[in-house]
């Protein structure tokens, strides 16, 4: 059955949203404001999934996708939407999530943080499959919502130097002894180096090693090998162990890392994000600053150039060891401290044990920082960091943690905005600023919140009685 629909909005999977007969329809390929004919492909009791058959009235924000694989490859979802409109949708999603999850509205919306929209992806995980029906070996991202590997010949979100490797990598894998036992190639680009990590399930032969070395010499890359878990990753050539690094030129820092270490996908946006975070924190020379979920010290080392002391805490000892080494190499050893701890299990006693911090930066993974937020909420007004900057890759967990800090912890949500870390995808990276309130203001806000809750309960009771 073909229906005609008016598209009202867009979700973060880049599906148009419409309503019909009390049901929500998610429409693949449609944009807000468009009038389209659709074919339903899946029916559920409360919603349907449909795909566009014809765009009768296109959106002014619709653009031609640059990539010939768009729509099949799962690497991108929004190439058909103008970049500024993509960011606007993410900003609206962030604000909506703050309200629906945390009943919060930022006092100020920060301008979006933009960077390159093409060739930005300096980290990628490429799947490898032997598919005789498609000519042999495929190397690329998965097809959208599928375990199949897309038949990719180029990729515009990868740097051109990596995109050009997709077809040569196919030929190289095909020449190996067991191409069907090499399921993955991870890509990590430093400012000067391309590293490829080959996952192999069987031992490599001397012939395989020769093929890898010939490929490296021809294409100017470095190979690392992984036979089992992450701890088995090692460079093919020993002298390449410390070649991978990114820079933070504003702070005069070079940050070495291993291809298995967490680093931001988008180097240009990372530099801009670090700069903005430090400006928002407004660190003074006498300040003591905490950097929680510090990783390699991406924020800790820049913070140490501005404050009296920067303390980085992270769950991975390998990362804190490398952060400590980088700090020493840059002459920041006396102004930094690093600790290894599971930040998902901390409490207020632990937080008090670290001593007082004037400022705090929190940059957790998608799981957020709920335990940290709860610990902060139990501090007395004089114990709290005066300002906190929270960098997030999940609006849902950010809103959850923000609600704890604001409704229970005596903080105000001063500002928030999106960081366009992943153009053409639905991933929302964001940054938020919290400021500690004085005790009188906190008590007043809590009393107002209790009064509103009572009024809402009374309204619901009256409605039920009627």
Swiss-Prot record:
Active site: 393 (nucleophile)
InterPro entries: 23S_rRNA_MeTrfase_RlmD, MeTrfase_TrmA_AS, MeTrfase_TrmA_CS, NA-bd_OB-fold, SAM-dependent_MTases_sf, TRAM_dom, U5_MeTrfase_fam
Record EC number: 2.1.1.190
CDD domains with a match to the protein in the record: AdoMet_MTases
Keyword vocabulary terms for this entry: 4Fe-4S, Iron, Iron-sulfur, Metal-binding, Methyltransferase, rRNA processing, S-adenosyl-L-methionine, Transferase
Function: Catalyzes the formation of 5-methyl-uridine at position 1939 (m5U1939) in 23S rRNA.
Protein family membership: Belongs to the class I-like SAM-binding methyltransferase superfamily. RNA M5U methyltransferase family. RlmD subfamily.
Protein name: 23S rRNA (uracil(1939)-C(5))-methyltransferase RlmD
Provenance organism: Bordetella pertussis (strain Tohama I / ATCC BAA-589 / NCTC 13251)
Phylogenetic placement of the source organism: Bacteria, Pseudomonadati, Pseudomonadota, Betaproteobacteria, Burkholderiales
Gene assigned in the entry: rlmD
């Amino acid at each position: 059955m073909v229906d005609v629909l008016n598209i009202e909005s867009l979700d973060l999977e880049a599906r148009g949203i419409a309503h019909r007969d009390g049901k929500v329809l998610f429409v693949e390929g449609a944009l807000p404001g468009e009038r389209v004919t659709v074919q339903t492909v899946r029916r559920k009791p409360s919603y349907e999934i449909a795909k566009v058959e014809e765009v009768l009235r296109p959106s002014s924000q619709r653009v031609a996708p640059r990539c010939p694989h768009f729509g099949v490859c799962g690497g991108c979802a929004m190439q058909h939407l103008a970049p500024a409109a993509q960011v606007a949708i993410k900003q609206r999603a962030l604000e909506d999530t703050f309200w629906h999850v945390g009943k919060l509205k930022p006092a100020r919306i920060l301008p979006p943080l933009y960077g390159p929209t093409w060739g930005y992806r300096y980290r990628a995980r490429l799947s490898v499959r032997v598919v005789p029906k498609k000519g042999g070996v495929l190397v690329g991202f998965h097809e959208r919502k599928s375990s199949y590997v897309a038949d990719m010949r180029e990729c515009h979100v990868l740097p051109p130097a990596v995109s050009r490797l997709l077809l040569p990598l196919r030929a190289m894998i095909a020449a190996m002894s067991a191409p069907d036992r090499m399921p993955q190639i991870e890509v990590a680009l430093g400012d000067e180096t391309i590293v490829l990590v080959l996952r192999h399930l069987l031992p490599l032969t001397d012939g395989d090693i020769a093929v890898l070395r010939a490929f490296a010499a021809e294409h100017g890359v470095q190979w690392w090998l992984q036979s089992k878990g992450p701890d088995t990753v090692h460079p093919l050539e020993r002298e390449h162990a410390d070649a991978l690094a990114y820079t933070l030129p504003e702070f005069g820092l070079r940050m070495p890392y291993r291809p298995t270490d967490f680093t931001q996908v988008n180097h240009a946006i990372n530099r801009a994000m670090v700069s903005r975070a430090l400006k928002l924190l407004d660190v003074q020379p006498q300040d003591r600053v905490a950097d929680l979920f510090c990783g390699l010290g991406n924020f800790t080392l820049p913070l140490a150039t501005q404050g009296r002391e920067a303390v980085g805490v992270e769950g991975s000892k390998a990362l804190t060891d490398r952060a400590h080494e980088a700090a020493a190499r840059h002459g920041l050893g006396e102004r930094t401290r690093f600790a290894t701890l599971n930040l998902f299990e901390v409490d207020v006693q632990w937080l008090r044990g670290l001593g007082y911090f004037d400022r705090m930066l929190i940059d957790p993974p998608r799981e957020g920082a709920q335990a940290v937020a709860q610990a902060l909420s139990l501090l007395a007004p004089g114990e709290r960091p005066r300002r906190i900057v929270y960098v997030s890759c999940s609006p849902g967990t950010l809103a959850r943690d923000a609600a704890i800090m604001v409704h229970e912890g005596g903080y105000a949500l001063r500002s928030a905005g999106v960081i366009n870390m992943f153009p053409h995808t639905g991933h929302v990276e964001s940054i938020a600023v919290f400021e500690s309130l004085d005790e009188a203001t906190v008590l007043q806000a809590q009393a107002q919140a209790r009064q509103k809750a009572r009024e809402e309960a009374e309204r619901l009771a009256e409605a039920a009685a009627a």
